[in-house]
Amino acid sequence: LVTDLELDLAKFMRINTGLNYGARGTAVDAWSDVAGAGAMMDSVGVPMSDNKYYLMNPFTTTSLASAQSGLNAADGLVRTAFEKAQIASNFGGMKALTSNALSSYTSGSTTDRLGDLKAAPDATYVTAKDTMQQTMVIETLGTGTIEAGDQIQVAGVNRLNIATRQLILDATGAAVPWTGTVLSVVTIAGNEATVVVSGAAIYEANGQYNNVDAAPAAGAVVTILGAAATVYQPNLFYTEQAFGLGTVKLPKLYSTDTVATTSDGMSIRVSKYSDGDANTQKIRFDLLPAYAVFNPNFAGQGYGV
């Protein structure tokens, strides 16, 4: 039950991220890759007081082992599961964690990874504010699919710090491009694809909520990041303000059922019943999760550089 919940939540987070750090498919092999994701969130405008997390594949830790000494040396007699998964309590402003429940997926099958915006999408705050999603029509594509979790970039659209409204520059002084994550699989038809992405690019003249330096324009080149039909398992970086997890209280099946609520608010239905023919007694646990996206631009997919 817990494993299924972790996998489902990780998939939801992967698809609903708005940020990207690193080159798609490049392994994280240095702590600078982790710190870079933290720098991305700080530059975007994530509050410095927020806890920031970097969730990585267990094998990634082997690449970082040489730099691990002393990062988490303090150890009590009893440690929680969270503490056991923790690699570093604060590295580059990030809490680095390891997880075997990261979501992997196969990228879309289209080998044509470049297209053009057929028309300028709606980039107003009023349209995006409730979902932080945006619809774009991409043309001049080939055939195949664009998969949920694939990320796109639009030429000439770069990120702003949402607090200062200043252009974000990376370590080399280059502008950081805006990235959107495709929310559901799309089949290309007639060389066109209509995609809905998380982390909408918002731009209005003198707009107080702008998060990019220019609105996506008709004819702008759209790049689908990564290679076609390739298995990816991105690391995740995020803050507590990015996503929410709750549960739905399930009705009892019989009067003898129990609906328990954990200390952190998780509702679990417990049903106890018997199989007379098999002479066995069984207990069933049911949990119905509910996920929410608070701000996709406070989370991202992480790779190496």
Residue ranges of model-derived segments:
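Core alpha/beta structural scaffold of self-assembling particle/tube/pore-forming proteins
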Residues: V2-V305
